[in-house]
Amino acid sequence: MKRFLTTLLLTACMLSSLTGCGSKADEKEGNGTLPIADNSVDFAYSLKLGWNLGNTLESTGTRLLNAETAWGQPKTTKEMIDYVKEAGFTGIRIPVTWSSHMNDDYTIDEMWMDRVQEVVDYGLDAGLYVILNSHHDCEKYFPTEENLENGKAYLAAVWTQISERFKDYDERLIFESMNEPRLINTAKEWWFTENDPDGLESIRCIVEMNQTFVDTVRSGEHYNKTRYLMVPSNAASAQNALSDAFSMPEDEADRVILSVHAYSPYDFAMNANGYTEWTEERAPELSFLDDLYEKFVKNGYGVVIGEMGAINKDNYEDRIAWAKDYTEKASANKMSCFLWDNNGTKIGSENFAMIDRRNQKIYYPEMLQAMLANYQ
């Protein structure tokens, strides 16, 4: 019997080598650091506190490898991403702009795809969950009826190629359909009234494009059948996700997650001319997290706050208090949070920083610890 079992094992090993089981993804499996939950809510929550590699692979204005440093960030290294893990983060979101690196038939340049894969590998090798998206490609998936078929064609082309490249990467790699799809360069880019016809049309188009994304990935091979997939509403806002016009895509694997961006409350977190103090009286302004729980989490859909943060207004103690309250409520509602980081440390709008990438240190350690404490 032992000889028979040995023969079977040897035969299985030989067959495995012939079928490509020694892939990059298989080398990553079984490292014992990252569990894969079997439902959307638990998986989304297992991402805990994550970090965005901001202003890097999503940079625009130049092509191919020069793009990575075009917005002032250093070239991403393995040591840098290892430090993200060391600092206590559980996941990394890698924003990527694809439309600057393809030809007219949407074929992505091989050199660009290789570099993106290299950075994804840094994250997985470090023991992090990785979110990969389509970032500053909003013109391609402009959410109107007039552009809907073009948007669906673009998403199908891009995610077919990405899915094929990463088909052997397990579920620790998450795909996110679009970044903040919206009516760019219009008066309704970031906000519209609840019943605005253009706004509602845009949400309906995004629902359809999210479905195209899910169908495209699921038509791929191997782990694409079971990979967790993130989808947003208009501008990835909580308000638009809560709209009756928005619904989650159908998915035979039942593994879709809502993606929300919430620099909230806006007047504290993002408006340079807003208020600077954070007190207990402000806590109700985070009630949108409860609303998201009611519509999505209670109905089996995980929620990831894919971008959040508060700009520096020379109010560090208040930002620590905000960070504690924000992540405490998010965690209580079984949502993970990914801190936006564009390495901007100056006082003023759009400056978000936590990790000094060049020197591998934390700019605001007390603020980070306040957030990590809610995901222990």
Q: Language-model features: where?
A:
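Positively charged n-region of N-terminal signal peptides that target proteins for export
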Residues: M1-L9
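Acidic/histidine-rich helix-loop elements
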Residues: L53-T76, D104-I108, N147, D267-E285
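Aromatic-rich peripheral "rim/lid" segments of glycoside hydrolase catalytic domains that contact
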Residues: N315-Q376
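C-terminal motif of bacterial Sec signal peptides marking the signal peptidase cleavage site
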Residues: S17-G20
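Active-site region of glycoside hydrolase catalytic domains
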Residues: A153-G274, F288-I311, A332-N333
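An active-site-proximal structural segment forming one wall of the substrate-binding cleft
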Residues: W71-I92, M102, Y106-H136, K140-S177, ...
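N-terminal carbohydrate-binding accessory modules
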Residues: K24-G91, K295, A370
